[in-house]
Amino acid sequence: MKKKTVCTLNMGDKKYEDMEGEENGDNTISTGLLYSEADRCPICLNCLLEKEVGFPESCNHVFCMTCILKWAETLASCPIDRKPFQAVFKFSALEGYVKVQVKKQLRETKDKKNENSFEKQVSCHENSKSCIRRKAIVREDLLSAKVCDLKWIHRNSLYSETGGKKNAAIKINKPQRSNWSTNQCFRNFFSNMFSSVSHSGESSFTYRAYCTEFIEASEISALIRQKRHELELSWFPDTLPGIGRIGFIPWNVETEVLPLISSVLPRTIFPTSTISFEHFGTSCKGYALAHTQEGEEKKQTSGTSNTRGSRRKPAMTTPTRRSTRNTRAETASQSQRSPISDNSGCDAPGNSNPSLSVPSSAESEKQTRQAPKRKSVRRGRKPPLLKKKLRSSVAAPEKSSSNDSVDEETAESDTSPVLEKEHQPDVDSSNICTVQTHVENQSANCLKSCNEQIEESEKHTANYDTEERVGSSSSESCAQDLPVLVGEEGEVKKLENTGIEANVLCLESEISENILEKGGDPLEKQDQISGLSQSEVKTDVCTVHLPNDFPTCLTSESKVYQPVSCPLSDLSENVESVVNEEKITESSLVEITEHKDFTLKTEELIESPKLESSEGEIIQTVDRQSVKSPEVQLLGHVETEDVEIIATCDTFGNEDFNNIQDSENNLLKNNLLNTKLEKSLEEKNESLTEHPRSTELPKTHIEQIQKHFSEDNNEMIPMECDSFCSDQNESEVEPSVNADLKQMNENSVTHCSENNMPSSDLADEKVETVSQPSESPKDTIDKTKKPRTRRSRFHSPSTTWSPNKDTPQEKKRPQSPSPRRETGKESRKSQSPSPKNESARGRKKSRSQSPKKDIARERRQSQSRSPKRDTTRESRRSESLSPRRETSRENKRSQPRVKDSSPGEKSRSQSRERESDRDGQRRERERRTRKWSRSRSHSRSPSRCRTKSKSSSFGRIDRDSYSPRWKGRWANDGWRCPRGNDRYRKNDPEKQNENTRKEKNDIHLDADDPNSADKHRNDCPNWITEKINSGPDPRTRNPEKLKESHWEENRNENSGNSWNKNFGSGWVSNRGRGRGNRGRGTYRSSFAYKDQNENRWQNRKPLSGNSNSSGSESFKFVEQQSYKRKSEQEFSFDTPADRSGWTSASSWAVRKTLPADVQNYYSRRGRNSSGPQSGWMKQEEETSGQDSSLKDQTNQQVDGSQLPINMMQPQMNVMQQQMNAQHQPMNIFPYPVGVHAPLMNIQRNPFNIHPQLPLHLHTGVPLMQVATPTSVSQGLPPPPPPPPPSQQVNYIASQPDGKQLQGIPSSSHVSNNMSTPVLPAPTAAPGNTGMVQGPSSGNTSSSSHSKASNAAVKLAESKVSVAVEASADSSKTDKKLQIQEKAAQEVKLAIKPFYQNKDITKEEYKEIVRKAVDKVCHSKSGEVNSTKVANLVKAYVDKYKYSRKGSQKKTLEEPVSTEKNIG
C-alpha cells in the first residue's frame, strides 16, 4: 500500500514507501548471507548478483547496499525482521565485509510516512473524488496556504498573525477559491483527525501529527497535496460527521486539534485570535465540521464558497448563476467567517480562552457532534435535496438564510441557491453552530438562550419576528432535535441551529424569494441572537435586506414557518418525548417552548390545508416576484428539513452513542414524525407546490441544469434506479423519500458506526444529492414533457424512452430488467460503503422528478388520492404492495440496513431484496400474464398471436432495448447458423444443465433469461407475426404438415430429417434453424419445452421439428425448463413467444389464430400436442373450463388438461411473470439454452433413445406421434417406444405441468404420478388420444421420471416459487404438490392410530386417506395443519364409523365443518 501511495506521491516518497513496504513485510529475503542468482533484494526486488550487496549488522538479510542504506536513512531496522542496526556490512569479493555506518533520518522518514499515509488517503480520496476535486481545486490554493499555516500553527501551537495574515492574504488573493478549498481542506484534516479522534484520543493526536506533517507535505507540494487533501477532505468531511457525531475526541486532543483548525479557519477572519485554542478549536472544530459539510456541498456548489468578503458582492450579484454560486460560496464562507469571527471576536473575547477551554471541549464535542449533526441534517437534507429540488429556489432562500447575499444569489439563481443551500445550510449550520458554540460557551443554557434569544428577537422586532419564527421553528426543530440528541448542548444547538437553519432557510427561501436580502436577515438575526460578532457582517446584510424583506418575509415566513411548524410540531412533540426521556432541562425548556410552538404548530397542522392555500396564496403574493416555486421548495424544504431534522435527531441521537437508545426511540419517533411531517408537509407543499410548480420547475430546471453542470453529475447515474422509480415516481417518490429519510437515519447511524465510511459515503451522497437536485429539475421538466424521457439518460441508449415504449419498458422495468438492475445497483449500493449513496440515490429516485411534483404527488399519495401510491408508500413501509416499488424501496431500506448489518446480513438482505424484487416482478408479470391470457382467451385470431406478441412486444419493446444485444449475440451465435446456434446452445445446454443442477439458480438464469427472454420475445413476436401473417392458418389447418414442413423448411428438415438429427446436431440445427427462421426452431425448441409443458399437449407433432425440439428438446426442457418453464410461464407473453417458438411461430400463431380449429385440429389429430398446446394456451387464456375440456380432449392426460388449464394459466402467469422478470434468461434458455439445456441433458440419455423412438414414431406416426415419442424418448428414454409416446405425452404433459407449474408441475406431476393427477391425465389422455394408453403406462414411468425432473424442477421451482409466489398459480401448483405430499403424510400419520385400532377398514383407510388428502390439498389455507388434518381424519373416521352405525349425517357434517376449518 505504501509503495503505491508513495508512487502516487513522489519518487522520494516512493522509495521511502518501498523501504517501508519492505519494512512492512518483505519477508521474502533469505536469512543467510549466501544468496543465489534467484535471490532478490527484498527492498528493490532486483537481483543481488550484479549489485553491491550488504546486510545489516544485526541480521543476515541481504539487500542491495543502496536499498538498505536508503532504508536505514528512513528506518534503521531490518525491513524483514525489524531488528535495529547502526551499520550495514557491505559485501565485496575483494574486501570481504565493509562496515558502513547508517545515516539516520528518522524524523524525516516519520514525517514522510505520515505524509505518505496522509497523502495516500488523499490520493484515494482524490481518485474517488476526482469530481469533487475540480471544485476542491478551488480550495486547494487556500488549502495549501492554510495547510501551511495550520502546519505552522500546529508546530508552534500559536496563532501566528503572520500565518493568519498569510492566510488572509491568500484568501484575499484567492478569496473564494482559496477560502473554500482551505476550509474544506481543513475540514478534511479535521475530518481525518476527528475520524481518528472519534476512535481514540491517540488517533486524533496521530492524525494531528499527520495533519501537521501533512501540512509540511502540503508546504512541500501545496497544490497537489491540497488537492489531495481536498479530495481527502471531501471524503473525510463525510467521515467527519459520523466522527464528529461520535464526538469521542478527547477534549485535550480536540482542543489541540481544534485550535489548529480554529487557527486555520479563524485566521481567515482574525489572523491572530485571542480565542483559546480550546474554545476556538471547538468553534473552529464545529465550524470546520460544519464547513466541511458545507465545504462538500460547497465543493459541489461552487469553488469559491469561502471568500467571505467576496461572497457578499457575488451574493449581491445574484443575477449570474456563477456569480450566484460564487456569491453563495462566498456567502457561506463569509457566514463561516463571521461565525469564526464571532468565535474569535465575541467568543474568544467574551469567553476568554480558559473559560472557553472547558466549554470548548464540551462545545467542541457538541460542535463536533453538531457538525455531524449538521451532516445528519444534511443527510436529512439529502432528502431535503428533494426539498432543495422543490426548493431549488428555496435552496437559494435557504442559502440566503445562511447569508443575505446568498438570498440574493438564491433569487438570482435558484439552482446555485440549491447548491449553495447545501453549502450555506452548512455555513449557516457552521455559523449557527459557531454562534451557538459561542452561546454555549457563554452559558450552559445557550440552547435556551438561543431559543429565548430567538424568541426574544421575535418579540423584539418584526425582523427578529421573522427570524424569530425561523428561530422558533429552528429552536423547536433544534429543541426537538435537542431532546433527540439527548441534551448535548452542542449537538442540540447544532440540531437547533440546523432546525433554525432549516427554518431560517425555509423562511429565508421565501424571504429570498420575496427579498433576497431578508433571507440573510433571519440567519443574521439568529447569529446575532447567538451573540455572534458575525452579526456585524450579517447585520449589514440584514440591515440592508431586512427592511424590504421583513414585512413580506414575516407574512411568508410566518406562514411558511407554520407549515414548517406543523412538521416541527410533530417533531417537537416526539422530540419532547425524547427530551423527557433524555431528561434534559434545556431540552425540556426548549420542549416547553417547542410545546407551545407545537400547539401552535398543531393548530397550524390542522389548519395546514388552509395554511397551504393561504400559504400558497400569500407566498405567491409575497414570493410572486421571487418565485412561488421557492416557496413550494421551501415547503418541501421544510418538510424535508423536518424529516432531515428528524433524521438528524435520529442520526444525532445515534451519534450520541450514550443516547443510542434514546436515539433509537427518536428514530422510531422521528420516522413516525417523518411520515407525519411528510404527509402534512406534502399536503401543504402539494397545494403550495401546485401553484409555484410551473414557475419552480423552470427555475429548478435551470438551476439544476446549471447545478448539473457545476456539480459532478457522475453521481447522477444512480438515477438509473431513479428512472426505474420514476416510472412509479409519483407513488415511489415519497416512499423513496420516506425510505430515504429512514435510510438517512439509518445511514447516519451507520455513519456513526462507520466513521470511515461516512466520508466517502457523504461525499458521494452529497454529490449525488447535488446531482439529484440538478436531476430533479431535468426530471421534472422531462416529466413535464416526457415523464420518463430522462430515463434514457440513466438507461442504456439502446432504449429510446418514448412515452409509448415507456409504458412497456416501465412494465419491463417492473419486470426483471430494471428491477434487477436496480436491485443489482442497490445491492451494490448496499454493499458499497456508503449507505448514503444509496439513500441519496433513493432520494434521487424519489426526487429525480420534479421534487415539487414528487412532493405534490407524495402529498396526493399521502392524501390517498391514489390508493396505489399510498399503498406504495405503505408498501414501502409494509412491503405489501407493488413488489417492484416495494422491492426497490425495500432494497433501499434494506441496503442501509445491510450496510449497518454484517456482510452476511448484507448479502442476505440483498438476496432478500432480489427475491422480493423478483416476487414483485413476477407478481406484476403474473398480473400482466393474466391480462395477456385474458386478452388471448378473448381473441383467438392472429391478433391473438399478436396479442401475445404484444404481450411479448410489450416485452419486446422492453426487449428491444435488450433484445438487440441478445439478437446480435444470437445472430453471432447462430441465429442464421443453426450450427452456430448449436455452439451457443451447447453452451446453453451446459448452462441449462447447470440450471438443472441449479434449478435454484434458475432464478439467476431467469435473471439472465430476461435478456434472452426479451430477445426471445422480440424475436418470437416478430416471427410469430411473420408466421401468422405468412400462413398460420394453413399450418393450423395442416398443423402437422405445415408445422412439420414449416419447421422442417425452417429447420431445413432438421426435425424432419430424423429425430436423431434433430436431437443430435439436427435437433440443434432445428433450433439453430429455428433461430435462423427468426427463432422458429428456437421457439420450436423453446416452444418444444413449452409445448412439452403443453407436451401433455405435446403430441403436437405438427411441429415435427418442434416435436423434435419439443420431443427431445421439449422433454429436456420439460425437466430443465420445468423451472425454466416456470420462468417462462411467468412470462406469459414470453410463453406465447416460446410457444410459438416451440410449436413454430406459425403453428402457435395458427393455434392462437384458430383456437377452434386448433381444438378441432387437436381433436382431429389426436395430437394433443399441437392443438392442445395452442388450444391449451388459448383455452387456458380463454377459460380454464375450455382449457380443461380442450385439454382433456386435446391433452392426453386430464392431468395435463387440468393442470394445463390451471397450470397453464399459472404457467402463463408464471411464464409471463418469470419471463417478465426473466424474459431474457427465459428466452435465452427457451431459445437455445433452456431448450438446449434440457435437450442436452435429456437428449443425452433420451437423446439416444428418443432419436430412435422419435424416428420410429416420427416415421410411423404423424409428427404428432413423433413429437410424443420424441418427448417420450427424450423425457422417458427408459420407457418402451410405444409407451414413450404416450409416456412422453404423459410425461411431457406432467412435466410441462412441472414446468408450467414448475413448483406446481411437480405437484401435478407427482399427483399425476401419485394418483389423482395421473388418473385424470390418463383418463383424459385416452379419451383425448389413443396415446393415453401410453400416458397411462408411460405416465407412470414418465410420471416417475417427471417426478425426478419435477423434483429438480420442483426444487428450482420452490426457490423460484419463492420468488414466483407472485405467480400464484405456479407456486400454487408447486405448493399443491408439496401440500399433497405433506397432507398424505399427515393424514396417514393421523389415521394410523384409527387403522391400528381397527376403527376403520383398509378400504375405509384408503378412502379416508384419499379424501382427507384431497380435502387438505384443497383447503383454502393451502397449508397442512397437522391438528386440522388430525381433526379431519378423525371426522372421517367418525363419519365412517357412524355411517356403519347409521349416523352418517352427523359424521358428514363433522368432516365438513372440519374441512371448513381446514379450508
Curated annotation (Swiss-Prot):
Its main location: nucleus. Residues 329-362, 750-759, 795-806, 1053-1063, 1185-1197, 1303-1316 have a biased composition (Polar residues). Residues 1104-1114, 1336-1349 have a biased composition (Low complexity). The modification Omega-N-methylarginine is found at R1151. Widely expressed. The keyword Zinc-finger applies. GO terms for biological process: mRNA processing; RNA splicing; RNA splicing, via transesterification reactions; spliceosomal complex assembly. It is found in: Nucleus. One of its GO terms (cellular component) is nuclear body. A zinc finger (RING-type) spans 41-82. The modification Phosphothreonine is found at T331, T410, T769, T807, T1153. Residues 457-470, 807-829, 851-927, 979-1019, 1034-1052 have a biased composition (Basic and acidic residues). There is a cross-link at K676 (Glycyl lysine isopeptide (Lys-Gly) (interchain with G-Cter in SUMO1)). Residues 291-428, 457-478, 750-1146, 1161-1197, 1269-1350, 1444-1463 are annotated as: Disordered. There is a cross-link at K596, K601, K610, K676, K1126, K1178 (Glycyl lysine isopeptide (Lys-Gly) (interchain with G-Cter in SUMO2)). Gene3D superfamilies: Zinc/RING finger domain, C3HC4 (zinc finger) (3.30.40.10). Keywords: Isopeptide bond, Metal-binding, Methylation, mRNA processing, mRNA splicing, Nucleus, Phosphoprotein, Ubl conjugation, Zinc, Zinc-finger. Residues 371-391, 785-794, 928-949 have a biased composition (Basic residues). Coiled coil: none annotated. Pfam families: SCAF11-like_C, zf-RING_2. Residues 1276-1286 have a biased composition (Pro residues). It comes from the Eukaryota. Plays a role in pre-mRNA alternative splicing by regulating spliceosome assembly. Interacts with SRSF2/SFRS2, U2AF2 and SNRNP70. This is Protein SCAF11. It comes from Homo sapiens (Human). The lineage of its organism: Eukaryota, Metazoa, Chordata, Craniata, Vertebrata. The gene is SCAF11.
